[in-house]
């Protein structure tokens, strides 16, 4: 029976390359000279430190820009709230989403079942498996999921006959 998986994975090596690009630009930009602006990554978290809101918003735009340049979807970033940090600086923690969370998986499964297509959707950990009798049904299901306007980037893998 034909099947495919819906996953949401972000290449962390490319994320690190994007962060390195932001760091290089931070060192060279005139408006950041002499400021206490830093960006660092630990696993799936990126931490932005800077002095004021305008610099923080510029830093956010730089991160988004470098994500696009590295062919990463900025929708994979979950922007935390801005917090006051030591020394009168601002801190923002950004999480890189990996995998499909349960709420989103349930939303996709519900949409597939409500469409009355001849496919079955099952949640397997942080990914979805869609199976059907015909490849055409699976392709129609992919079109349906793409049309759901989901912010998180999704990939369609393991397309099997």
From Swiss-Prot:
The GO cellular component terms are: cytosol
**CDD domains given for it?**
YajQ_like (cd11740)
Q: Which InterPro entries does its entry note? A: DUF520, UPF0234-like_C, UPF0234_N, YajQ-like_sf
Similarity comment text for this entry: Belongs to the YajQ family.
What's its job?
A: Nucleotide-binding protein.
User: Which keywords does this chain's UniProt record carry?
Assistant: Nucleotide-binding
- What protein does this entry describe? Nucleotide-binding protein RC1_3464
User: PANTHER family under this entry?
Assistant: UPF0234 PROTEIN YAJQ
Q: Name one GO molecular function term.
A: nucleotide binding
In terms of Gene3D superfamilies, this protein maps to: 3.30.70.860, YajQ-like, domain 2 (3.30.70.990)
